[in-house]
Amino acid sequence: MKRLETLESILERLRMSIKKNGLKNSKQREEVVSVLYRSGTHLSPEEITHSIRQKDKNTSISSVYRILNFLEKENFICVLETSKSGRRYEIAAKEHHDHIICLHCGKIIEFADPEIENRQNEVVKKYQAKLISHDMKMFVWCKECQESEC
């Protein structure tokens, strides 16, 4: 999906958020955001930690979990719960999209479908509601897993 914001603008917002919350600026917070931004995919806390440890051997998984909680609370990242691969994280500064998640291998596919979006808007309008957000996840067995089970 197309990114809506540059890494530098996200990091600038992060610095302002850290200051607003009365916290000290931390290179590790910026590094977690950078890893997620550059990956362009959904990463586990372990994958994020492994990536950061390439530069900083002292990074702990517990620090990464604390940082992820802060980033999620401040809407810098989105969390995706999957049954196979646990919590996965992605940068929030992307165009709206939905997810297809394979229950067997944990593969995640992002997609955007204008027809689905239009239909959701029609449903909201029918009930005279105001759509704030939505998150669609479809749990499937991907093509590869179906073929390997035959």
From Swiss-Prot:
SUPFAM superfamilies xref list: Winged helix' DNA-binding domain
Region DNA-binding, annotated ranges: 1-93
Binding site for Fe cation: 96, 98, 117, 134
GO biological process, one term: negative regulation of siderophore biosynthetic process
Residues at which Zn(2+) binds: 42, 90, 99, 102, 105, 110
Residue ranges of the TM segments: none
Quaternary structure and interacting proteins, as annotated: Homodimer.
Descriptive protein name: Ferric uptake regulation protein
